[in-house]
Amino acid sequence: MTTNPAHTALWPAPLASGAVDATVQVPGSKSVTNRALVLAALAAEPGWLRRPLRSRDTLLMAAALREMGVGIEEGVGPDGSGEAWRVIPSGLQGPVTVDVGNAGTVMRFLPPVATLADGPIRFDGDPRSYERPLHGVIDALRALGARIDDRDFGSPGALPLTVHGGGALEGGPVEIDASSSSQFVSALLLSGPRFNQGVEVRHTGSALPSMPHIRMTVDMLRAVGAQVDTPESGGEPNVWRVTPGALLGRDITIEPDLSNAQPFLAAALITGGKVTIPDWPEHTTQPGDALRDIFTQMGGRCELTERGLEFTGSGSIHGIDVDLSEVGELTPGIAAVAALADSPSTLRGVAHLRLHETDRLAALTKEINELGGDVTETSDGLHIRPRKLHGGIFHTYDDHRMATAGAIIGLAVKDVQIENVATTAKTLPDFPDMWAAMLGTDRA
């Protein structure tokens, strides 16, 4: 686990004074925005992204693509309403250096894109990014014919690295172990239509985490004209094939980020109140959609109406035994709610969270326990026994979901202070203001 950072700014997490009753407009999905940016950059014609998420991760992706030669114009949409980005594909060029920050989508999705550039593209990022695995993408690209230097600056299979683009990549079949991150599969699929032979990705490792994100990638590829064969469409298990061909420039509206709705739905559950999330899609591949079922099991009630998702807490919070392997990013928020429940919880299937922005399992265990909790790490998750909690400093380790988990606990526990709440800007800009507005208070 990354050491507690030495931030001095502490944010007093607001204590809920009663049941919340709010409508919260959640910004666009990071996962959808960054996939849409890559696909638009690789298209044969310009396209539009409506209601994109403007956050650190998405701005890093846009800046990286601009560095490589893609035109991205920020303004309003073709109909004159709402923010929209016009993406104008162009020949990708090096030499340039790309800052990935600590964004998994940027550090994993863009090396395959860089193989199509003329010239070297160097990738670097935050110190924590050096610890995150990239070997799946690097090894696969080498097997497909790419030249990559990842040994001159740091550890092999990690940042920093340089992709020596040759203007094209042969592509074809490749085997990878993506058990540590489904983004390895998505990264190859997104650029696959531009490879000379397309790409056939065969996963050879243990169970794949976060399968909804792969389904999201496949659906978005098909929406821009790519032909994709998948296990779900009658193909071989653990094999995805993308046929080479031109991608279409589309006018895409970005769904709200359902995972970022989690703290607000949790507030309704904890306070016995009601929160409405407008524009919740009826059908979606986003992992956050699982919150409807999970938080219902934990004591809430939800209804999808024309206004959006209406979620109501019952005043009781129940423990849960749940496999989160497909929706691991929801673990911090669920753990925070579970720490306030009336019975124990077991969260399973999330060993891969040890490789996320921080070691989320170790971080959650340490921070909840330091507030008086009783959390034990298991081989693939957490066991949480509710205890009476007390105030204290909740460290975030520069992890946005740790920050929102601390805010959730702070609703019911007095004097919780969040270290570096600004890290929420990674995917949820203005979180402190949104939180205060939901509670009907001035920003703390």
Predicted regions located by residue number:
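Structural preference for solvent-exposed beta-strand-turn elements
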Residues: 1-444
